[in-house]
Amino acid sequence: NSLTHVLCLYFTVYFFKDKRHFFDNCIEWLMPGGYLIVHMVDRESFDPILPPGNPLYVVSPQKYAKERITKTKIVFNDFEYTANFNLDKENDIATFDEKFKFEDGKVRKQQQTLYMEDTSTIVNAAQDSGFILQGKIDLVKCAYENQYLYLFTKPN
């Protein structure tokens, strides 16, 4: 009961397999009337291309692609970075496969697992923990189409 705000931004909520446990913790941490702000996406239509890999920047190339673009490639001074987003919507799991290829030939690979239930399921988990949904902010003006900030409060 000591925090006024908890921010859960940039896909953090999707790293939690047990989201109800996360929301239960947040409700304990927040003071009455405190805010929980959670960044969520429409898992089937958000643009998984990382911003530095998007040549159009302000406009999503997804609008013009016949199929959803899930791969990113970025060339930095010392290494090349590639990533691919794979969604298994039947199991509510996505993987984000990353590869860093350095000039000396060394390669680093990593895979992040995201537990991506649809947004209504996540909102219901927050409400089951006692949160009140106050609103949803569309991030389209920040060039993040199909991405949102959900604003929850702990009851007084």
Q: Model features per residue range: what roles?
A:
Residues 19-20, 146:
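Conserved strand-to-helix beginnings and helix N-cap segments that scaffold or border functional pockets
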Residues 113-156:
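C-terminal lobe and adjacent flexible extensions of AdoMet/dcAdoMet transferase-like proteins
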Residues 8-10:
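Residues lining the SAM
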